Regions:
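Alpha-helical scaffold segments in carbohydrate-active enzymes
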Residues: 46-49, 154, 193
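Divalent metal-dependent catalytic cores for phosphoryl transfer on phosphate-bearing substrates
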Residues: 56-169
Length: 202
């Protein structure tokens, strides 16, 4: 199988089959299985739309589609009954848990997307300051693909009542603002860079 390189030239293993991986950890036909596939497809579609607008980067579209489908793979390990998940970890932990899963599966670059998509990414300083129940290390999106998927994810609410809806950029800004000023400023920079600028002051 072909090895993967992202925009920075990092090597990252072989190409995954996202549905096969999801089926390994989620019971087909369960609400959690349905949710993670629907949400992943919507984030992937939005991320690919963004990628087409930023051809100068240039992001890898196949990698974006795969990683977007798998970015929430760790939610089954969290206590999120509204998503059909009855694990022991708090929901915020699903990012680094997803990284562990995909690293074990042999997909380290896709694994980074899992860990780095919470909010606009978490810094070690804010993890320590806020006492967040995740490892104390920087979990920030670095590559264009990681940033695009993280940004695209912010347009889709978490939960059964509105999982098929897409937020406006104003609604996404209001949601991300709850994480703090740094997150909102980063989101706004991405909105400009990715040409999604309605409602954002340049």
């Amino acid at each position: 199988m072909n090895s993967i390189k992202d925009c920075t030239g990092r090597e990252g293993g072989t190409r995954p089959d996202p549905i096969a991986i999801i089926n390994k950890y989620y019971e087909p036909g369960s609400f959690a299985h349905d949710y993670i596939i629907r949400h992943g497809k919507m984030v992937a579609e939005k991320a690919l739309e963004i990628a087409e607008r930023v051809f100068w980067l240039p992001p890898g579209s196949m990698f974006i589609e795969e990683a977007a489908m798998l970015h929430d793979i760790g939610i089954f390990m969290t206590n999120a009954p509204h998503l059909g998940c009855t694990g022991d970890y708090p929901y915020i932990a699903h990012g680094y848990l997803g990284r562990q899963i995909l690293e074990d599966e042999g997909y380290p670059l896709h694994a980074y997307v899992c860990e780095r998509h919470v909010g606009v990414g978490l810094t070690a300083a804010e993890i320590k300051e806020k006492g967040l129940p995740v490892p104390c290390r920087d979990m920030l999106p670095i590559t264009p693909e990681e940033e695009i998927i993280c940004f695209a994810d912010k347009f889709f609410p978490v939960g059964p009542d509105n999982m098929l809806t897409m937020r406006s950029i104003e609604e996404a800004r209001a949601e991300i603002g709850g994480y703090g000023v740094r997150h909102l400023r980063k989101f706004d920079r991405w909105a400009i860079m990715f040409r999604e600028v309605s409602g954002v002051k340049e």
